[in-house]
Amino acid sequence: MRFCFFFCFTASIFCTTGNSSDIVFCCAHTPCLLHLEVDQETSVTWIDSNTGQIPLCLSNGTCHISEKGLHFSANFSKDGLYIAIINETNYHAAEHYYLVYIYENCHQMPYDSPRHTGHKGTSFNWSMGLWLVKCSHNKTFFLPFVLDSAKSAPIIMTETAITIYISMIFLIVSLLTFLNVLITLNNKYKHYGV
């Protein structure tokens, strides 16, 4: 049995320690998209990091490439790291996507967001905020996210969002610690009748 919290934690560690920039969570047995829009003059090559070759799913028909990115069919549900090699005039880059599938009580919703245009037409439809992920056994977790506007609406966790999330946790813990110190001092002064 898989729990999305386990995946979120594992993928978060991978994202902050590895080379990945985006972590995409998708519901199993539903279509999924690694979203990367580029202009017609831009060349994009997708690579499976496990093999260093083009993804095997392209040859067996469980995924395909379009101007929107790398699409996975509902029949595909294998976690893995995929790299998009972007080649433009005087510009070369690599976008890393770690794909994680959630199997139980996973809910995806369509979402539309403003377009953010990157270098020379490379664009990403992203919107940052907090996303409520419902897991098995009625567990819920608020996670930092960047939502793709595709109908499959995968949850994408970026390094920036993870940093914000960790900062929020640190701030909350600091406030609780400060509050605890105030309560302790208050009780101490009451004990001595000050």
Swiss-Prot record:
Coiled-coil intervals: none
Keyword annotations: Early protein, Glycoprotein
Glycosylated residues (UniProt): N19, N60, N75, N87, N125, N138
Signal peptide per UniProt: none
Protein name in the entry: Early E3 22.1 kDa glycoprotein
Record carries keyword Glycoprotein: yes
Organism, as annotated: Canine adenovirus serotype 1 (strain RI261)
